[in-house]
Amino acid sequence: YVEMINDSMKTNKMVGLIQPKNGKKNSVPSLHGVGCLGKITSFKNMDGRYLIDLNGLNRFNIINEIKNNKPYRECEINFDNFQADLKFAKEELKFSDLELIFKNLKSLFKKKGYIINWKSLEKQDLNETINALAMASPFSLEEKQILLESENLEIRKNKITEILATYDYDGFNNTTIQ
């Protein structure tokens, strides 16, 4: 994806991220229909590799894929179904509404060896926090896609709760049933 980042840095510093669907090895996988447009906010070249920070701006639907000779894929996209992403309306959820989710996420992240600065997260906007945790989580690509496609923060919160419930019935205590 080095060429994609190079091309982006020459223009608007934006890239679209789309998850591939599970496909057969050695084939070009089909893409999920919903992705997210992100803006590169930090860029470092490290020995031919890039370390970037990407700020998610707006979800989109794929209209069709554009054929090209580039080592990355391009698509015609549409933002119409995600106009609410552009509105900065305050959601009714509060951090206190998420205490159980945070507790379960902390347990899962610890179990998987993830290190998260929770105090820093609690200083961020709630929407940014939920989105960052959803994408940084050890959830499967399909589970992350479900979260991406969730219509709003309340639905995303409920989906995270449902996904967490599938990981371990006993609160991530490694209990085995035979």
List each language-model region with its residue ranges:
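Positively charged
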Residues: 2-115, 142, 146, 153-156, ...
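Core structural elements
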Residues: 121-139
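Small/polar glycine-rich anion-binding or flexible loop at a beta-alpha turn
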Residues: 123-126, 148-153
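Amphipathic alpha-helical segments within well-ordered protein domains
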Residues: 134, 145-148
